């Protein structure tokens, strides 16, 4: 039953995507999302990819754009990563929600911030690397294909997507865990929808082929995918 239940991506809306959500509710949800990312090692795939890219290219400075940056927690981890490895990072967060910018500033997120739809950025905008985490499952397939092509054009050295795997086990785990830990109601509501909107390896193969973007598709524990280019010259 579970296999057929999650066979195709859901199009059910997440509350976090609702612009009517107030700033206080949004910030509360972001705090609990950061907690979930921390206990599930959700930052590790992106930071390991940055390690590989720096080792391959030899660069000692990087401009980084985080798309769908939320409260800036990934940018804060990348800032710490850069300091620990002696890599200068110029960080930019991008999120279309004004509440995200306010939450990121309140949390002390370093770098610049852009409140806009990513496709509204200037055509000549370029960054050394573009990353996103738990963002692509918010997009319908057609917009995701467009996003893959967009990153290929706008990233000098490479890009990396870090997102969920659609499967019954994480769905059940999040349904139980978010309730047992009494997390924010928006997180409780959205967590299982996020899994249902997420991707399988077959999805990623189809979508990257449609976009015409060569990419590495790698399984990440627990129940995540890393979709990335491994570094341009």
Question: What are the roles of these predicted feature ranges?
Answer:
Residues 164-208:
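C-terminal alpha-helical "lid/dimerization" subdomain adjacent to the S-adenosyl-L-methionine
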């Amino acid at each position: 039953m579970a296999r057929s239940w999650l066979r195709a991506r859901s199009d059910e809306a997440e509350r976090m995507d609702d612009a009517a959500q107030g700033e206080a509710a949004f910030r509360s949800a972001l705090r609990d999302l950061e907690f979930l990312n921390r206990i599930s090692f959700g930052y590790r795939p992106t930071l390991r990819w940055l390690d590989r890219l720096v080792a391959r290219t030899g660069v000692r400075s990087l401009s980084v754009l985080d798309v769908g940056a939320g409260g800036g927690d990934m940018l804060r981890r990348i800032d710490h990563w850069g300091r620990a490895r002696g890599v200068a990072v110029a960080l930019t967060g991008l999120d279309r929600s004004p509440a995200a910018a306010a939450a990121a500033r309140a949390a002390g997120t370093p770098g610049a911030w852009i409140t806009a739809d990513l496709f509204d950025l200037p055509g000549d905008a370029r960054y050394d690397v573009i990353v996103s985490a738990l963002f692509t499952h918010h997009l319908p397939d057609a917009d995701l294909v467009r996003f893959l092509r967009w990153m290929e054009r706008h990233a000098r050295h490479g890009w990396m997507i870090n997102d969920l795997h659609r499967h019954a086990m994480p769905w059940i785990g999040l349904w139980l865990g978010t309730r047992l830990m009494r997390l924010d109601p928006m997180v409780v509501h959205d967590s299982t929808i996020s899994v249902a909107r997420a991707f399988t390896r077959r999805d990623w193969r189809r979508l990257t082929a449609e976009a015409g973007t060569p990419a590495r598709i790698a399984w990440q524990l627990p129940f995540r995918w890393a979709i990335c280019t491994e570094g341009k010259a």
